């Protein structure tokens, strides 16, 4: 993916925004986009994916979202139920692992754009809980004892409505751009 982002027919980007996007893409660091609601932060990720010819994987964050959900979730209740019903799938623990959006991005055979939308809605520790995974582009699945590594490092676009401050350690790892209200 050697294409550069120059905006699209439906998204007019400022020069500063183009520089931020292309720096993040080229240097493989997350791009943090802040701005008021309705300024086009989420649409920007969609347009970056279109311009680069990349699939878009969207992870919309809520106040209850935990970082672990982006990696995977282990459904122990379903496994217990299946064991009581004599289901043979119970012997393979991977049958009860539900892949999260980061895993989906890491599994992509082509370089995707991963949108982590409205990160500031989550708990204050949420961004720090993703630092290692976003830096190394890998994580460990404890239940199956396997390490999941990104096949292609995704273009990571993170949006924030500036509702709360993000941790300094997280901010230092991102390229940043503020979109002003038109």
Task: Give a label for each model feature.
Residues 1-18:
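Dynamic helix-loop-helix/coil hinge segments at AAA+ ATPase domain boundaries and subdomain interfaces
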Residues 13-15, 22-28, 36, 105-109:
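Phosphate-binding P-loop
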Residues 31-77:
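Walker A/P-loop
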Residues 54-58, 167-182:
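A short helix-turn-beta junction within AAA+ P-loop NTPase domains corresponding to the substrate/partner-engaging
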Residues 71-109:
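Short glycine-rich substrate-engagement loop in P-loop NTPases that contacts/grips substrate
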Residues 96-97, 103-111, 141-159:
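AAA+/SF3 P-loop NTPase mechanochemical coupling elements
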Residues 100-101, 106-134, 165-167:
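Conserved AAA+/SF3 P-loop NTPase catalytic/coupling segment centered on the Walker-B
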Residues 119, 136-152, 163-169:
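Conserved Walker
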